[in-house]
Amino acid sequence: MRSIYLLALVACSNSSGPAPDPVADDDPAAVGVDVAALSGLGTVTNVHAVACNGAPMGSTCRQVTVTGCPGIASEPLDAVVAVRPAMGTLRGTVVHFKGGGGEGFQGSDQNYEAAGFRNVYISWLTDWEQTQSAGIKTAACRPATILQWVFTEPTLHNSSRTLGFCGEGFSGGSGQLGYALAHYGMGSVLDYVNELSGPPFTRIDIGCNGDAPPTSMVCGVADTTRLPSSLNAWENIQSPLKCGSTSVPPSELARWKSDSIGVGGVYNYPKTQVQFFGCTFQATAVTVMGNAYFNTISQAEGGNPNLAQYHCYFQSDGCQGEQLGTGLSDAKQALIAGCVPRHQ
């Protein structure tokens, strides 16, 4: 049976004992208010129609180029943007981000169209996290830029404040949304966000540090904190170091920490509701990391359940690893109810 955890129950995420959550942020300056983008955005260019190969049925597709992101201005990246129109009266726009490197289309089986939502699916041509020498936070300018473009594009959301503008991401896709909120000011445009199994990049310095605690308690279950080897390339970790190394130099740990979603960003989103859905059974690090991001938001927002909630799922709910079981249908209903205009 699933459980919903609000700030008043944050202790339950560490219920096995009094030890502090190893993923909790110890930097009191790492909370803030909903302000303009902390990091600059790039530009969407070269917009043109393309065939919808592999896109959800009924989509029309455009390929775009994201360029000009600070720190990686000479490293443009293309994405395919697939759009499925709403059925009936239009209620808003939902932007979807897939896990891993973001190649492919996430969330088409949720069928939000039937509830009146235009669906926009982002598929990167290569891993959005990958840069020549920077880290994931710098690369996260790319999804934030494309999110801002969808919001303002006249043929898409057209900057409407009478319709909901919302996001949904799975695993690494929830990381795209997490960075957009925490480090790129997207709390100023997003009304509602579903974070499904993630985000995984809340504390890279803990997830990649072989000397850090290997597990953390989430909803009474000890789940892994260890991030996968894909972080080696995405975070440009130089050999002989790797994600999972022990005796990591302090300067490298500091870089990993600085590149994390949960450090040094904005975590108070007074006009954005964020809901998290995580599986505790045979979980990957996305469960611990997603719970840590939720805790950071909840603390910044005073535990307001209208702004942030964390939904736990267990083996009895049919979840396993990053798959949510009954949580997927709960997430669908939460978005349908929560994707309403809040920035009016």
What is the predicted role of each segment?
Residues 132-159:
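Alpha/beta-hydrolase active-site loop
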Residues 160-220:
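Primarily recognizes the serine-hydrolase "nucleophile elbow" in alpha/beta-hydrolase
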Residues 225-316:
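Serine-hydrolase catalytic core
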Residues 112-130:
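Conserved alpha/beta-hydrolase
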Residues 80-84, 89-99:
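Short beta-strand element of the alpha/beta-hydrolase
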